[in-house]
Design a protein with these regions (language model features):
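Internal/C-terminal transmembrane anchor helices
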Residues: 207-215, 221-242
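Alpha-helical transmembrane segments
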Residues: 105, 162, 187-188, 208-220
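Redox- and metal-dependent alpha/beta enzyme cores, enriched for Fe-S-associated oxidoreductases
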Residues: 196-199, 240-242
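Alpha-helical transmembrane segments of polytopic membrane proteins
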Residues: 199-209
Length: 242
């Protein structure tokens, strides 16, 4: 009901699509009886309906035209920000938004897709359907905003957590990977903000390369094995950047 108040009909449409597709794949329509729809629907209307009725009372058909026409139909068919209307916009958002956990999220998504259709894996199936429904729905819309993908953060994080034990041990050094990733990302952000263009892109490339080597060194050997080389590489990057 709150989603409908803030986003309009789409606030019920996409969650309803997720539930429908999940029940369709599970072939357990009897679950609808356990959703207490006879109680839920009146509560939904009690929360959402008064505002819509009041707005219609104040503005008449203009409210319907603006709500459905401008904020739903036009956004779906006409891009408000044409520069964002590219195929790689949402993939880039996903990769950046989950830093420094992107690798674990991608691993969880991959394992979840593989397990989604197993008979005894309803939770991964539900989470994958949840993510896919929102992602595909908003990818097909002409207007693209980073905030449109917010509903997939929660199921993506759950998948990453569920399949974390299946991540190879050499990639599970959280005490090293997390601070190191944050460190190198912070350096790249700082280079982008404070180093003059186009030199900043060169510095970002150096920091990115150094960060990748740093993490790969840690994953291949015990703590401190390649520390001297990493320190020298870091100092070199600082000298070049300065």
């Amino acid at each position: 009901a709150l989603a409908v108040l803030s986003k309009g009909p789409v606030g019920a449409l996409v969650p309803g699509l997720v539930i429908f597709l999940f029940l369709l794949t599970q072939k357990k329509w009897a679950e609808l009886l356990h959703m207490r729809l006879l109680i839920g629907i009146p509560i939904f209307l009690l929360i959402a309906a008064p505002w819509f009725l009041y707005m219609y009372h104040l503005h008449g058909k203009d409210f319907v035209i603006v709500l459905l026409g401008v904020h739903n139909f036009l956004r779906a068919t006409q891009p408000e920000h044409p520069e964002n209307n590219v195929f790689y916009f949402y993939p880039a958002i996903v990769l950046v938004a989950f830093l420094p956990w992107t690798g674990f999220v991608l691993h969880g998504l991959w394992k979840g897709i593989l397990d989604a259709w197993k008979e005894k894996a309803p939770i991964p199936r539900f989470l994958i359907i949840w993510i896919a429904s929102y992602y595909l729905f908003y990818s097909l819309m002409a207007t693209k905003y980073p905030t449109y993908l917010f509903p997939i953060w929660f199921p993506s994080a759950l998948l990453a957590a569920i399949y974390l034990p299946w991540v190879p041990k050499k990639f599970r050094f959280f005490e090293y990977i997390l601070p190191i990733s944050i460190w190198w990302v912070a350096l790249m952000v700082g280079a982008y903000l404070f180093v003059p263009k186009p030199l900043s892109w060169f510095v970002i490339g150096l920091f990115l390369t150094a960060g990748i080597f740093h993490l790969s060194f840690i994953s291949k050997g015990p703590k401190g094995r390649f520390l001297p080389g990493v320190v020298l590489l870091t100092i070199s990057c600082y000298l070049i950047a300065s």
